[in-house]
């Protein structure tokens, strides 16, 4: 008998833990995963701390088939999730051409500049 694939969600952010921001992504993700037969088995919330993010990523990826993250992927210096994911899996991180193209198209459409800070969002492990 086969079981459904499992997933975990790692929610990242001091603003979540302090109550300043309410996470709305878990509810949406759980519903969408259920529709396709994937069981969301655990949700963990950690602070904007690189060691906490890296450790949680390693622990969750060892226990579940897929790990989704929410938070810390913006254009500011404190958005460190991508770097922590790279560290958790011991892989290199750099700007990916397809991600750069998506961001360039978006910012061109909105009439805003794709600056270095925004280009950080195209960095993928």
Residue ranges and their predicted role:
Residues 79-125:
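Proline/glycine-rich low-complexity loops and linkers
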Residues 47-58:
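Structural motif
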Residues 18-21, 52, 77:
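Secondary-structure boundary/capping motif
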Residues 2-43, 47:
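Glycine-rich phosphate/diphosphate-binding loop of Rossmann-like nucleotide-binding domains
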Residues 65:
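Conserved acidic residues
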Residues 14-15, 72-75:
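Short glycine-rich anion-binding loops that position phosphate/pyrophosphate groups of nucleotides
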């Amino acid at each position: 008998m086969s079981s459904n694939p499992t997933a975990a969600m790692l929610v990242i952010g001091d603003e979540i833990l302090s109550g300043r921001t309410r996470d709305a992504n878990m509810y949406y993700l759980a519903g969408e995963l259920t529709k396709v037969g994937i069981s969301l088995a655990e949700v963990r919330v950690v602070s904007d701390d690189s060691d906490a993010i890296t450790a949680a990523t390693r622990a969750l990826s060892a226990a579940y088939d897929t790990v989704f993250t929410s938070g810390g992927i913006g254009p500011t210096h404190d958005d460190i999730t991508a770097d922590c994911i790279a560290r958790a899996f011991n892989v290199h991180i750099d700007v990916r051409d397809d991600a750069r193209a998506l961001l360039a198209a978006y910012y061109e459409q909105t009439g805003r500049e794709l600056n270095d800070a925004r280009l950080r969002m195209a960095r993928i492990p």
